[in-house]
From Swiss-Prot:
This protein's GO CC annotations: plasma membrane-derived thylakoid membrane; plasma membrane-derived thylakoid photosystem II
Protein name: Photosystem II CP47 reaction center protein
SUPFAM superfamilies per the UniProt record, alphabetical: Photosystem II antenna protein-like (SSF161077)
Membrane topology: Multi-pass membrane protein
Main location, first listed in the record: membrane
GO MF entry, a single one: chlorophyll binding
Subunit structure: PSII is composed of 1 copy each of membrane proteins PsbA, PsbB, PsbC, PsbD, PsbE, PsbF, PsbH, PsbI, PsbJ, PsbK, PsbL, PsbM, PsbT, PsbX, Psb30/Ycf12, peripheral proteins PsbO, CyanoQ (PsbQ), PsbU, PsbV and a large number of cofactors. It forms dimeric complexes. Contacts PsbQ.
Transmembrane segments: 17-39, 95-116, 135-159, 197-218, 234-255, 451-474
Top-level division of the source organism's lineage: Bacteria
Pfam families (alphabetical): PSII (PF00421)
Disulfide bonds listed in the record: none
Residue intervals annotated with topology Cytoplasmic: 2-16, 117-134, 219-233, 475-507
Length: 507
């Protein structure tokens, strides 16, 4: 038939059996990739430090999605939350990966069967003996089944009735764990950070889907609507399916980038807005002030700050810091975090406490500026020493550390002070191992950034695909000159062109 590469799907346009086959093969490829990718990530994953070297720092992509649904342990005995010596049974990371690979093989065999046995009685109208698909009925079946799945996921898996529940945590991502979640049916269920709303909405949406599916199975569409929306054309199915997919892709791109209820920061890393707002910095300061009010010293107060919370308050963990085309995990950029060095407090020779202005998300380089409590610049690291008025040497800045590895130490050597000021510009300071991965010092984004970028791009492409195929099916008679009411059957897989006398008709 000599089809160009971009028209090859024409061969399944009038062939329901092989249309099923190629969809089965596609699902086999997806399941096979997911299982294989999970095994690859498990092979390179370092589970030794769940606090400073979590999965999102290591560039894991499929493991976080497994963990948020309740799979958190490995047959090697470790858990995402840091425990060791565990026996998770079959439903471990490896077990789920193996299940996907086995499923992929079964789907492959099903695809082969349907490719060979394509001409089934199922696709023939018994009244006329002609090939026919009842697309509105198929729509009802799919709607009913997807509603059933949605309801089952919410009512059983998430609630813990028959399943593990879901990943829940505190607002600062410190206590994350998997637990059953009760549905929240009140106004609080609409709080985007309330996991109970996720459960309630899956149950509600599932019920709506089941009812809608039964409706479409029992009620036929009006003839005018059937013809107006080309409900008898398989390309209508393609167009509306693409619409569902691109809409879902836009939604999940938004929830991934802006939210963390279903994309916990312990599994996917912080959002960029938490750095923009100083979200973790405010919580750290609140905890320190609370300790000071109870009579603790600065050293004691800062020593109560969890290392995990301090690590979130570091700009290198913001997904907006890595360029979209810098490949590799975050650890390939700044290195593997080893320890928190403590909180630095800078003072000039006048005794004023100075604060280093933090680097915004979208800057690669930023001037190191130290301001007093009133926001007045008192010291900096100048670009041109010849014109400097506020250099560390001129202003006599010193730095003292509270909490962390350098607790209680004070540095007055200008080169040391400048080194720690540059670290403070990036948030809380950490020592990094840059040798293990030959880290180049250039920030990378987290899986949160990859997922958002990928889904936003594909959503845009699929949006145009929806417009394209929707236009083709609505205006098929205009584009092809084929009457939409034409009932003459052509050979399966052969494209009927206008005035094409060579197209073989069925006997």
């Amino acid at each position: 038939m000599g089809l160009p590469w971009y028209r090859v799907h024409t061969v399944v346009l009038n062939d329901p059996g092989r249309l099923i086959s190629v969809h089965l093969m596609h699902t086999a490829l997806v399941a096979g990739w997911a299982g294989s990718m999970a095994l690859y990530e498990l092979a390179i994953f370092d589970s030794s430090d769940a606090v400073l070297n979590p999965m999102w720092r290591q560039g894991m992509f499929v493991l976080p999605f497994m963990a948020r649904l309740g799979v958190t342990s490995s047959w090697n005995g470790w858990s995402v939350t840091g425990e060791t010596g565990l026996d998770p049974g079959f439903w471990s990371f490896e077990g789920v990966a193996a299940a996907h690979i086995v499923l992929s093989g079964l789907l492959f065999l099903a695809a082969v069967w349907h490719w060979v046995f394509w001409d089934l009685e199922l696709f023939v109208d018994p009244r006329t003996g002609e090939s026919a698909l009842d697309l509105p009925k198929m729509f009802g079946i799919h709607l009913f089944l997807s509603g059933l799945l949605c309801f089952g996921f919410g009512a059983f898996h998430l609630t813990g009735v028959w399943g593990p529940g879901m990943w829940v945590s505190d607002p600062y991502g410190l206590t994350g764990h998997v637990q059953p979640v009760a549905p929240e049916w009140g106004p609080a269920g609409f709080n985007p950070f309330n996991p109970g709303g996720v459960v309630a909405h899956h149950i509600a949406a599932g019920i709506v889907g089941i009812i809608a599916g039964l409706f479409h199975l029992t009620v036929r569409p009006p003839e005018r609507l059937y013809k107006a929306l080309r409900m008898g054309n398989i390309e209508t199915v393609l167009s509306s399916s693409i619409a569902a997919v691109f809409f879902a892709a836009f939604v999940v791109a938004g929830t991934m980038w802006y939210g963390n209820a279903t994309t916990p920061i312990e599994l996917f890393g912080p959002t960029r807005y938490q750095w923009d707002k100083g979200y973790f910095q405010e919580e750290i300061q609140r905890r320190v002030d609370s300790q000071l009010a109870e009579g603790a010293s600065l050293s004691e107060a800062w020593s109560t700050i969890p290392e995990k919370l301090a690590f979130y308050d570091y700009v290198g963990n913001s997904p907006a810091k890595g360029g979209l085309f810098r490949t590799g995990a975050m650890n390939s950029g700044d290195g593997i975090a080893q320890e928190w060095i403590g909180h630095p407090i800078f003072k000039d020779k006048e005794g004023r406490e100075l604060e280093v202005r933090r680097m915004p998300n979208f800057f690669e380089t930023f001037p190191v500026i130290m301001t007093d409590a009133d926001g007045v610049v008192r010291a900096d690291i100048p670009f041109r020493r010849s014109e400097s008025k506020f250099s560390v040497e001129q202003t006599g800045v010193t730095v003292s550390f509270y909490g962390g590895a350098l607790d209680g130490q004070t540095f007055s050597n200008p080169s040391d002070v400048k080194k720690f000021a540059r670290k403070a510009q990036l948030g809380e300071g950490f020592d990094f191992d840059t040798e293990t991965f030959n880290s180049d010092g250039v920030f990378r984004t987290s899986p949160r950034g990859w997922f958002t970028f990928g889904h936003a791009v594909f959503a845009l492409l699929f949006f145009f695909g929806h417009i394209w195929h929707g236009s083709r099916t609505l205006f098929r008679d205009v584009f092809a000159g084929v009457d939409p009411g034409l009932e003459e059957q052509v050979e399966f897989g052969v494209f009927a062109k206008v005035g094409d006398l060579s197209t073989r008709k069925e006997a």
